[in-house]
Amino acid sequence: IFLSALRDMFKNTPKRQCIVFTGPPNTGKSYFVFSLINFLQGKVVSFMNAKSHFWLQPLADTKFGFLDDATDACWTFIDTYMRNGLDGTPVCLDSKHRNPIQIRLPALFITSNVDVDKETKYSYLHSRLKVFHFHKKMPLDGHGNPLYPITDANWNSFFTKLEKQLDICRSPESDNGESERPFRCCAGEPAGTL
């Protein structure tokens, strides 16, 4: 199910561009997504800056965004103002020292302690979000570090092994068998017409 959600996200499928990880505190949601967003070279936005008109500005310059720890107030904001953005339709984004720009929001990862998919007041968001639940505490070693660290090398291996299932492209190999550039995650070419 996670692979299907990622594939839809990478292909910019309408209403399939937001993956949410919910669960109680200390289950590793943020750790998991921070490692992924770091690998994908995405940008992080924070709802604590929501009083500023420009808090979503970093999303204008990236293919992947991350909103950590969405509270009930944040979900209310998303439900009120960001539904069209989650649908994949163009929205107007206000940027500091620039004119407002019209963009499609990038693929968005959100972590939350709120089970948004079970809240009836957010029923209009249910079709726009793919929710995964983290129920178990994240295992830590004696020093408080993750027992199973997630690194860029882990993500590289994940995407390399599952590139076919995720329908992602890799740069063509050069004559000596080496890639011409590092692995980059992007949607594959659309299928040809019949």
Model-identified regions with their sequence ranges:
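Sparse, context-dependent recognition of short Cys/His-centered cofactor- or disulfide-binding micro-motifs
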Residues: 4, 44, 50, 67, ...
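Single, functionally critical "micro-switch" positions that shape active/binding sites
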Residues: 28-29, 67, 99
